[in-house]
Amino acid sequence: DTDRSRGLGDVYKRQNLQCPDLDLLKCQSNNLTTLDVSACPKLTVLYCDENQLQELDLTNNKKIEYLRVPDNKLQNLDASNLSKLKEFYCNNNELTDLMLNSLELTWVECQNNDLQSLDLSNLPALYLLRCYENQFETIDVSNNPELRGFFCNPMESLKTIYMSEGQDQLLQAFEKPEAAEVVYK
C-alpha cells in the first residue's frame, strides 16, 4: 500500500513492479505519470486516483473488480476486457473515449470528462451512474433495469435520454438537463 506516499515519481515502471501475486494496489496521490501493471495479472483492486497518469493499459488485468482512476489526465481508457468489474470511478479526467463491458458492473462515476458518448448496453447490473459534465447528445439507459441513481445534470449538450417503460422511478429521483427530452423505448 503506497497510498499517499508523496513523491514516488515513476517507481512503477515495468522493471520495478514484478508482482504476479499482487491483488491490491493503492497508489493514490503520488504524482505518478506512468503506471505499468501488466505484470500483475491477479490484481482485483487498483486505486490510483490523484496522480498525473495520461494512459493506463489494463489488458493483462482481467480480474480487476474495483478500479479508481479519478483526478488524473487520462484521455482514453479501455476497460472492456474487465468482465469482473463491479465499481469504476474515472471522474475528473480528460476522457474522450471510454469502453465498458461487464455484466457485474454496478457503479460508474465518469463525470467531469470530455466523453462524446457512453455505451451502457452491456451493463445490465448498473445501479448508479454519475455522468454529468460531459459532451453527450444522447444517452441510453433502457438496457439498465437495475439503475436507481442517475445523475446527468448539468450537461448542456444532452438532448435525448432513452429509457425503458419500467424506469419511471428514475424520473422521481433525477434532475434532467432542461433541454433534454426523455424518450421511451
Predicted regions mapped to residue ranges:
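Conserved hydrophobic beta-strand positions in leucine-rich repeat
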Residues: 6, 23-27, 44-48, 65-69, ...
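C-terminal capping segment of individual leucine-rich repeats
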Residues: 4, 18-19, 28, 39, ...
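Canonical leucine-rich repeat
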Residues: 13-14, 35, 56, 77, ...
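Single conserved hydrophobic/aromatic residue that forms the stacking wall/gate
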Residues: 1-12
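Consensus "Asn ladder" position of solenoid repeat domains
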Residues: 30, 51, 72, 93, ...
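Serine/threonine-rich, low-complexity intrinsically disordered segments
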Residues: 3-4, 35, 71
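Leucine-rich solenoid repeat scaffolds
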Residues: 141-185
